[in-house]
């Protein structure tokens, strides 16, 4: 994928997910008074006459409504909807099915653009019923998926993902098949299914055209983030470290490149510094923010495990130096993760030595079998109680 701007290949940015990101930023205490973010968001609201969205925005962010602005936008909405209704009425009286469908689509797109969620959903569903061409039906489903992502409506996203899959199986083209993977991957990030997100994103790195969701740099950044937490080291090397498309973009993303390569090259103190930067970025990202604590914790465990795999034992001082932290910090971290069963090692407090005690594969399989057997037994017992009732 070349780096030049190819946004014309994407679908319309309607709704524009950048608006959802700006709204999220303004909900954070540290950005609540950020004039630049507020100005950018309000410029989008005014430019698109987003009266319904503006009312909901003021309510959620506890803003004072600008009554004059709201009335002006409502008037613009009424005038445009009247014009669109007249065009639809004319098409129904004088034109064919294709023109009727186009008029219905224009109204649905306008309702979507101004932030009238329920009105847009109703209009798109009516248009869908009037649409025969498979490609056009899929484009409507992509609209519904974008609305779902914009408002983070889980039910809307899951229902329309299944609908899109079904339509693609009927004969969807290559471009729409790949586009759906990006939509699914983005939703997987939102619900913390990083493994599935990595698989979907890596499948579409070389074919990405979903600029209606994000630019290519953001897509590559997300791909690196989810791949690092989801992939084993050999897969990370083959699919990311050696990925030509990813490497090309990483030249213009030095912080992301350092984050990726510092872990792979075992430069742990640099990795910890990069992880701290990633943590701050994730806090400000509307998709990653709910998961940043989990992500950072898992990546620390990942780094500790990677170092420990190379040794039978090593001193706490060596580990602390490797990660660029104090001995007390590393002692507390390891103790916490060992107690939780996340690290296979033990700490000799007297000699300040960390000794690895990785379970062999047969022992691990035995423990897994026992665990799964207990779960199955519990489910059978619950089922038998229900049946007996």
UniProtKB/Swiss-Prot annotation:
One Gene Ontology CC term in the entry: secretory granule lumen
Transmembrane segments: none
Keyword Ion transport: no
Highest taxon in the source lineage: Eukaryota
InterPro entries assigned: PCI_dom (IPR000717), Rpn7/CSN1 (IPR019585), Rpn7_N (IPR045135), RPN7_PSMD6_C (IPR049549), TPR-like_helical_dom_sf (IPR011990), WH_DNA-bd_sf (IPR036390)
GO BP of this protein: proteasome-mediated ubiquitin-dependent protein catabolic process
Name by which UniProt lists this protein: 26S proteasome non-ATPase regulatory subunit 6
The gene coding this protein: PSMD6
């Amino acid at each position: 994928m070349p780096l030049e701007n190819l946004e014309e290949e994407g679908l319309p940015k309607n709704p524009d997910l950048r608006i959802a990101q700006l709204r999220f930023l303004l909900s954070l205490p540290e950005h609540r008074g950020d004039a630049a973010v507020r100005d950018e968001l309000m410029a989008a609201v005014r430019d698109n006459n987003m009266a319904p969205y503006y009312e909901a925005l003021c309510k959620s962010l506890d803003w004072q409504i600008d009554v004059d602005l709201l009335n002006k936008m409502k008037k613009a909405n009424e005038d445009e909807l009247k014009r669109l209704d007249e065009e639809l009425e004319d098409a129904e009286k004088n034109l064919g099915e294709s023109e009727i469908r186009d008029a219905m689509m224009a109204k649905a797109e306008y309702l979507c653009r101004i932030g009238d969620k329920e009105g847009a959903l109703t209009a798109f569903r009516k248009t869908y019923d009037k649409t025969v061409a498979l490609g056009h039906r899929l484009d409507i489903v992509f609209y519904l998926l974008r609305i779902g992502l914009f408002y983070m409506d889980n039910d809307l996203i899951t229902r329309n993902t299944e609908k899109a899959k079904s339509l693609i199986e009927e004969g969807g083209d290559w471009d729409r098949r790949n586009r759906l993977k990006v939509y699914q991957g983005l939703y997987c990030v939102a619900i913390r299914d990083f493994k599935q997100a990595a698989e979907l994103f890596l499948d579409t790195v070389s074919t990405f055209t979903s600029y209606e969701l994000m630019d290519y740099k953001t897509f590559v950044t997300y791909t690196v983030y989810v791949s690092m937490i989801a992939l084993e080291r050999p897969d990370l090397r083959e699919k990311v470290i050696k990925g030509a498309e990813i490497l090309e973009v990483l030249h213009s993303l030095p912080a992301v490149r350092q984050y990726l390569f510092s872990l792979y090259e075992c430069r742990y103190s640099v990795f910890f510094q990069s992880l701290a930067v990633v943590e701050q970025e994730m806090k400000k990202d509307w998709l990653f923010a709910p998961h940043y604590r989990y992500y950072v914790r898992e990546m620390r465990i990942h780094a500790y495990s990677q170092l420990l795999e190379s040794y039978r034992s090593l001193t706490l001082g060596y580990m602390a130096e490797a990660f660029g932290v104090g001995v007390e910090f590393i002692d507390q971290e390891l103790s916490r993760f060992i107690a939780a069963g996340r690290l296979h090692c033990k700490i000799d407090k007297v000699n300040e030595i960390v000794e690895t005690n990785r379970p062999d594969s047969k022992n691990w399989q035995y423990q897994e079998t026992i665990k799964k057997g207990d779960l199955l037994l519990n489910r059978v017992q619950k089922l038998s109680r229900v049946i007996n009732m």
